[in-house]
C-alpha cells in the first residue's frame, strides 16, 4: 500500500502466505519487463509537455465521477460519465505537463502516474456501475427502485463477487464467483 489505493483484505492475506518464500530475482524476465514498462510509461508522461498539471486532471476526474457515478446514479449519467472519462484520459495523454526531471524524487511525476492510474480505474468503476442493473449497498440506480422509492435489489443475478480483467486489447471483462450464505441468511435491509 502506498497511500493512494486501499487494498482488500485478501491481498495482505495472500502476501502473508508468501513470507519466507524466495523473492523473485531482479534479473527474472517478469522483473525486467516491469522495469521496462515503468520506464516507458514515465518517459511517455515526461514527453507530453502539455499545459495542465496532474492536479487539474485529478480534480476534473473527481467532478465527472461525482456527477455521473456517485451514490445516486442513472444509466444516462453513467453513459455520459464513461464518455467524459475516456475523453479526459485522451486529453491527459495529450496535454499533461510534468515539471521537474525523472532522475530523482519528483512528486509531480508521482501524481501524474497516479492520475493515469485513476483514469483507468475510473473507466472500470463506471463500466461496473453500468453493468450492475440493480440498486444495492450504498449505490442507488434510479432505474432500479420500488414504487416507494426504495432500492430494488436483484439477488438472482447479482449474488456474486466480481472483479474486472483488462485484456490485451484494452477491453474489460467482468469475472464472477457466486456467493453462498451458510451462517447468516441473505435478506433485504429495510430502514422504515
Task: Write out the residue ranges for each language-model feature.
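Glycine- and aromatic-enriched mobile tails/lids
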Residues: 1-192
Amino acid at each position: 500500500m502506498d497511500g493512494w489505493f486501499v487494498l482488500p483484505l485478501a491481498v495482505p492475506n495472500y502476501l502473508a502466505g508468501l513470507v519466507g518464500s524466495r523473492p523473485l530475482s531482479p534479473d527474472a524476465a517478469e522483473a525486467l519487463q516491469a522495469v521496462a514498462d515503468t520506464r516507458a510509461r514515465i518517459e511517455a508522461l515526461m514527453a507530453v509537455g502539455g499545459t495542465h498539471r496532474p492536479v487539474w486532471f485529478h480534480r476534473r476526474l473527481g467532478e465527472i465521477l461525482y456527477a455521473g457515478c456517485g451514490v445516486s446514479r442513472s444509466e444516462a449519467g453513467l453513459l455520459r460519465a464513461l464518455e467524459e472519462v475516456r475523453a479526459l484520459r485522451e486529453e491527459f495523454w495529450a496535454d499533461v505537463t510534468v515539471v521537474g526531471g525523472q532522475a530523482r524524487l519528483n512528486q509531480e511525476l508521482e501524481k501524474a502516474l497516479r492520475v493515469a492510474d485513476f483514469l483507468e480505474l475510473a473507466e472500470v468503476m463506471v463500466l461496473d456501475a453500468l453493468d450492475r442493473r440493480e440498486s444495492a449497498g450504498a449505490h442507488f440506480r434510479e432505474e432500479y427502485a420500488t414504487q416507494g422509492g426504495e432500492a430494488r435489489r436483484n439477488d438472482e443475478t447479482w449474488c456474486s463477487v466480481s472483479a474486472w480483467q483488462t485484456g490485451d486489447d484494452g477491453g474489460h471483462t467482468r469475472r464472477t464467483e457466486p456467493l453462498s450464505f451458510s451462517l447468516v441468511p441473505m435478506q433485504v435491509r429495510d430502514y422504515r
